[in-house]
Amino acid sequence: MSWLTKLLPPKIKREQGPQRRGNLPEGLWSKCPSCEAVLYATDLENNLQVCPKCGHHNRLNSRQRLDLLLDSEGRFEIGAEVLPVDSLKFKDSKKYPDRLMEANESTGESDSLVVLQGAIKTMPVVAAAFEFDFMGGSMGSVLGERFVRGVQAAVEQKMPFICITASGGARMQEGLFSLMQMAKTTAALTKLSAAGLPFISILTDPTMGGVSASFAFVGDVVIAEPKALIGFAGPRVIEQTVRETLPEGFQRSEFLLEKGAIDMIVDRRELRDQVARVLALLQKLPAAA
């Protein structure tokens, strides 16, 4: 028995030790994955999940992104009744319906895209946001149909359409049905363009695969969050293919801005104001307050 054990009787250790630990709720602190600063979770939440030390943008879910962008009143969801089905009876290490059920239980969403009609500083819009935590934000039949219905609503109501992307690409469990959505979504946007209505594409970390190869870059204005990973194949896959070391920051939003692939990089805390200014400019309206 050590001298410390003799000084602290077992009864005290049993009663006080666990009690002290119990007074600290879980999730009180968060560690920044970029600068490794230890942050108070409430402060991080109040800062829209942006690290106050280094500016790293942590990921948000679809509802958080839409709440950040849209006015709180007068919103309603489009396409929520469209639900996924296992047409191919696909099975890898798990059955597709089992994966859908797990994703639904963990996120509360029925698929990887949420579409809302609402307003930004009283300017009517239709906005869609990807749910990355639902099977990696993968693009399947439901996502494509909800996207198209959102665009159709924008055309019918003569509103701009906004999409916030966060996706790993096509959903392999739906095979060619998934790949079809690349053409389906892009074709729908031609009707929006023909009607003279703006499409603003907001790229967040990560925007990869079939999403980046289809509609993500066809916006009238393409905005990205800082240091977002944006591309088709991942950097490691490219390095293994070309057998060369890629430049530092390759496929990050700053690299794409330098090469002219996107129009601007906007800090999340300034996104709503910036999108409102862009909407007013594109629609020839007075600048939003």
Swiss-Prot record:
Q: Which cofactor does it need?
A: Zn(2+)
Reaction catalysed by this chain? N(6)-carboxybiotinyl-L-lysyl-[protein] + acetyl-CoA = N(6)-biotinyl-L-lysyl-[protein] + malonyl-CoA
- Which domain of life does the protein's organism represent? Bacteria
Report if keyword Transferase is assigned.
yes
Q: How does it assemble?
A: Acetyl-CoA carboxylase is a heterohexamer composed of biotin carboxyl carrier protein (AccB), biotin carboxylase (AccC) and two subunits each of ACCase subunit alpha (AccA) and ACCase subunit beta (AccD).
Its biological purpose: Component of the acetyl coenzyme A carboxylase (ACC) complex. Biotin carboxylase (BC) catalyzes the carboxylation of biotin on its carrier protein (BCCP) and then the CO(2) group is transferred by the transcarboxylase to acetyl-CoA to form malonyl-CoA.
What protein name is recorded for this chain? Acetyl-coenzyme A carboxylase carboxyl transferase subunit beta
Q: Which gene encodes it?
A: accD
